[in-house]
Amino acid sequence: NRDHLISLSRLNVHKAINENIRAVGMTSRWIQDDDSISIFNLAQPSFSIEGIPLCLRPTFIQLHVPHHPWIDFFPFPRMRDCMILAGDSFDDDDLCHDLMAFWDTRNTATTLLVWGDSWDAKNWEITEGFAQKWKWLLLDSPELLASTNRWRKFRGEKPFIWKDILTEA
């Protein structure tokens, strides 16, 4: 049924995040502590970004603004910067729940979908519910918006009209 599909989709996001954790050189233990600081903010003499997939490489903001490492695992640089700059002004637990709470079927329309290699932004898609709820994260994320419509077109669905979704009250 549809609830199981959404649960599987969230499980895929969980898997994708874990793959991206490894791709940037961290372990899942690194993010378990609420007080963890991104590896990109710590002095790492042997650390090199050369081996990190392009979409996951740290931005200037990631390198200079201390933040929790969970933000580093999304392949959307502008969205990561937006989350870091927002600081404590948004409920990151609520966002995490929408993305990865595969055990909860109450709010199934608000999630991300991952269709391929997790480090490639072209393999991610957002649902309309996610776009409406978290639109402030998407206003400067054209790669995620383009990828979403590419996947919708692939399935024969109408593309989202972003100006309508992102400007709705």
Predicted regions and their residues:
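Transcription factor C-terminal regulatory/effector domains that mediate ligand binding, dimerization
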Residues: 1-169
